[in-house]
UniProtKB/Swiss-Prot annotation:
The gene is wcdB. It comes from Salmonella typhi. It catalyses: UDP-2-acetamido-2-deoxy-alpha-D-glucuronate = UDP-2-acetamido-2-deoxy-alpha-D-galacturonate; UDP-N-acetyl-alpha-D-glucosamine = UDP-N-acetyl-alpha-D-galactosamine. NAD(+) binds at residues 26-27, 46, 50-51, 77-78, 97, 165, 169, 195. It is an enzyme of class 5 (isomerase). SUPFAM superfamilies: NAD(P)-binding Rossmann-fold domains. One of its GO terms (molecular function) is nucleotide binding. Belongs to the NAD(P)-dependent epimerase/dehydratase family. This is UDP-N-acetyl-alpha-D-glucosaminouronate 4-epimerase. Optimum pH is 8.8 (with UDP-GlcNAcA or UDP-GalNAcA as substrate). GO terms for biological process: capsule polysaccharide biosynthetic process. Pathway: Capsule biogenesis; capsule polysaccharide biosynthesis; Glycan metabolism; Vi-antigen biosynthesis. Homodimer.
Amino acid sequence: MTAYEELRTKLVLAPKRWLITGVAGFIGSGLLEELLFLNQTVIGLDNFSTGYQHNLDDVRTSVSEEQWSRFIFIQGDIRKFTDCQKACKNVDYVLHQAALGSVPRSLKDPIATNSANIDGFLNMLTAARDAHVSSFTYAASSSTYGDHPDLPKIEERIGRPLSPYAVTKYVNELYADVFARSYEFNAIGLRYFNVFGRRQNPNGAYSAVIPRWILSLLKDEPIYINGDGSTSRDFCYIENVIQANLLSATTNDLASKNKVYNVAVGDRTSLNELYYLIRDGLNLWRNEQSRAEPIYKDFRDGDVKHSQADITKIKTFLSYEPEFDIKEGLKQTLKWYIDKHSTLYSSV
């Protein structure tokens, strides 16, 4: 039995009270679903700026009515300290996912990104400290590595940030570290590497590449690749991220606390490889033989050419073991979008 399997069993036997910020978002709704499956009580905070009611509705269809009754939703904003205080009351564990999470968005509107990602983060840290929560796990980002050339990326080696978004996520780490040293506060940062999976928004100017390409191919629309397609990423399926959050929040090992960890698979896939995995995967699911080819555009400002994580640290300290590689994660993701796209995204 893995450490994560043992933890899931333990949580069912001794339920806790959790707060998820950004609960109506892609990752937040995934965490909500898993915690409700485990019969936990979950408080969710969201202002629907980038999250969606239909994500919460979809979670509701996947859990029992009894499990759903353990979910308490607060429509609020992390930029308002009183909302953060209300959400943190009587909470054991905080999973802070709320943020404006787009490099292009941050280049277009750095002030809004700073407000949500730094001011909002500090509000949540302070409210959680004052509420004496057991732990505060927050979404950090692989963008923190910036222009550092080394591959794979190791937590202790970072470069200069390449976007306002990257600046905000690094500032999160600095604040968490100061709170840990100044207030004996338990915070763990998770540097996510290109997370994908069910409920990830395929629409809009700032959509991630995997859901956008899936929806476009389902609608027989052209696929655009920024650059020549050799750009590569360490794509990480949502279930791996959920595992990392729960292991981080509940660890009792002092040596593992107040650290930052990469959350990824530890491998990389080029955009060209990704395109054909998605196209051919959809062909299998739909019993079709599409041979559509991508259209190449200019490289996108603020992006790094290659990204791959070293996951030795999180495996060592938290016993994290990614259960889904890119192929298995895509298999699950494609099935979800094929089943759901006509009802959730048909109007776009």
